[in-house]
Structures are given as structure tokens and as C-alpha cells.
């Protein structure tokens, strides 16, 4: 198999990268009806598999789970999750032959094996679904031509897919139809019904492409969503301790700080996050963000280039063949960092204190979001997709750090995201430690920024620069579709 994207000519590549249309709510008037009465079999019962299945069942669809015989016989976690929630469970041979839609929600590295096992069992003119297009785009998987291939990709972890649905809402979602596999022209109808069944249509759906989803998703998770948070956590904690701060306080400030400051990001973008600061602190955060951009800009664009070319995927798949040697080594090293082993702090940190004492962290968020967004757009990805894969998902990932620090983040995200995170953070961490940390001033981290005289012209120019960045302009529009967003709990 060959990387699908690299088999396309330039016109086709640009067309696929630029597929992005925000769908009108009226297009989902039929909701999940197209799939009602059809048999839907989900392969895999992890976070996405279970929670999408629960939502789809509650939307009136016929859902069952196909698991490997050993998972059933040994009553593994996937079997227990499915059966404890009252789902029918069977082997591939028992369930796949009668399925109208088979949804593959296993980890990326298992996709080729799953396809090889289930495709011979699938009935003629059935459909096959993904929630991430890596197997199609990067691996170059070829699916039988009578099978319709679609994607529904919720832009958040599986647990949030369920929680938002239970509230009567949903999470923003990308849908796509593989252009090589839509023999009956039903792909879009299938994807729309599936998205509606998960609740995604209530938060906004982008009609995209497998290519655009994969390239933007990989970029976001490697850089701002995971890599920048990991690098920032490590260097900020080390700096606080080096400055004599209580290690327990430093650990809590970082662990819960990302979640608290990005909650403002979720509700009102970078503008609101920066508005939580005093004028003096805002100007300093803006200055620090510009310095971070200069230091890390090349790394963001390198990751984007490596993703588009397929170099990243080839490197990671080589590690798959080597039994994930690099992945496991990097995971172990992360577990040994000082931040991961910081003592517990029982004192209270107010919401505003996270902002006042975390100016450097805010600067990292601002710089990281803007760099990731700009790199994606410069590579042909539309602004809507770039927004969802940078700013929108950041509070959700920050929430995982609040639960159990970097360990939890790396457990929740996919192995693909985790591998990319390490590639980025392993380079970004020493750069930040060498070029940014030594030049910090009093009040950049761990204590409030001293008040200085601020002139109106400078403040106006900074405010204009913040509010008029393209990620803020498109974000204001897209957040209008998400007016019922749940507020993530802020720790005390």
C-alpha cells in the first residue's frame, strides 16, 4: 500500500486539503433517520467506540459490537464495557455479514488488520466507517469498490461526546466521504445520519475530506494540543522550582492552570483569555508570545511539512514495526519528569490567581494556537478546520492534564497523537528552556506582573492585533454555533 495523498496530483491534493463547508442545520432535518432500521456494528469498544455507540443507540439506531474471540472469552475491558451497557456482542463472523454499516473505532495501528479481517465478511453494497482517516490517507488502505467509505470525526475525546449528548447538545464534528468509495452516492447521507446520531449536528458539522481531517488533526495534536502543553508543563514547573517556589504549589499551578486559562479561551477565544489579565500583564504576555513564535515557529512549520509529505507517518509506522520502541521509551521518560512527580498541594488557588501567576503559560497558549492555525492555513487547510484542530480542542486536552497530569493526557489521546506529541515536545522543551526561560522577568511566572504605566496607543495596538488575528475572526463565527457549551469545572 502507498500513501494515498502522495498518489494524488497537485490539483487533487489542493482540492482535498481545501474541502471544508460548514453545513446548515436544515441539512440535518432528517437527523439519524437514514440509518434507522439498519444494522450497525462497531468494531472496538474504547472511549470513542463505547460513547458513540451509546449516543447512536439513544438516537434509535441498532447497535452491536464485534470483538475478537479472545476478547470475549477472556472478558477483556472492551467486552465488559459493551455488555455492562447492555449491548449485543459477538465475533466478527457472527455480526459482520449482516451489517449495513461497520464502524471501525479501533486504534490507528490496528486498522489494517481490522480491514483485512472484516472486509471479506462484509455484504455487498454495505458501508464502512472511520472516525479518523489515517488508515485511508497515510497507510493507503484500499477498500472493496462496492463498499461505501465514510468518516465521522467528533472533535473531542469520547467521554465528552457522551456528556454533551446527555445534555441534549453535541460536539463539533467533521464528516467526509472517501472519493474512491461512494458507488451508490449514499456516502453523505450515511455520514450525516451517523453525525446526527452522535449529536454532532447540534454543535456544528463541517463537510470535509479524509485528507483535510488527517493532515489538520495530526498537526493540531502534535503541536498546540499536546506537544506544547507537555513542553510548557515541564519547563514552567522546572522554572518555578528553580526560583524557590513550593514544588507542590508549582505542580498545582501548572496542572490546573492550563484548564483554567483555556476555559476563557473556549468561551471567548484568545481575546477573552488575554482580557483576564491586567493591562501590564496583557502587554507582557503579548511580548512573550511574540518571542515564543520566533523561537518555535520553524518547528511548527516543520511538523506541518512532515505531515503533508507523509514523512511523519512513515517514521511512526516504522516504530510500529519496531514494537513501539521509541514510543515506550518517550512515555517512560515523561513519567520521570519532575512535574509528573510533583507533590500534592492542598491549598486553594483562586481562578484569577491562575491567570495572574501564569502569564508565561498564557503566552504559550496564544503563540501555540496562532502558530498551529497559521501553519495549517498556509498549507491549504481551510480556517474552519484549522480552528477546530487548534483552539477549539485545547480546553478538552487541558482538562485531561488537570485530572492526572501528562500521564492522563497521553492515555486519553491516541497512540498516533502521543507519538507526535513526543516528537514535538522533545525538541520544543530544550528550545524553550534555552531561549525563553533565561530571559523571563519578575511577574512572568509564579507571581503577578508588576504594574507599569501603559499608554493608550500601545494598548490599543495590542488589543487590535489580538482581536484581528484570523483565528479570532473565524472563532467568533464558529462559537456562535456552540452557544450552549458546557463550562469545564475550574479547580480551586
Curated annotation (Swiss-Prot):
Give the InterPro entries listed for this entry. 6-PGluconate_DH-like_C_sf, 6PGD_dom2, KARI, KARI_C, KARI_N, NAD(P)-bd_dom_sf
- Ligand binding (Mg(2+) 1): 217, 221
The free-text cofactor remark is:
Binds 2 magnesium ions per subunit.
Positions bound to substrate: 414
Span of domain KARI C-terminal knotted: 209-344, 345-485
Q: Which UniProt keywords apply?
A: Amino-acid biosynthesis, Branched-chain amino acid biosynthesis, Magnesium, Metal-binding, NADP, Oxidoreductase, Repeat
Q: Which PROSITE patterns match?
A: KARI_C (PS51851), KARI_N (PS51850)
Q: Which residues bind NADP(+)?
A: 45-48, 68, 76, 78, 108-110, 158
What positions does the entry give for Mg(2+) 2 binding?
A: 217, 389, 393
Q: Name one GO molecular function term.
A: ketol-acid reductoisomerase activity
Q: Which family does it belong to?
A: Belongs to the ketol-acid reductoisomerase family.
Question: Any idea what this protein is called?
Answer: Ketol-acid reductoisomerase (NADP(+))
Q: Which organism is it from?
A: Haemophilus influenzae (strain PittGG)
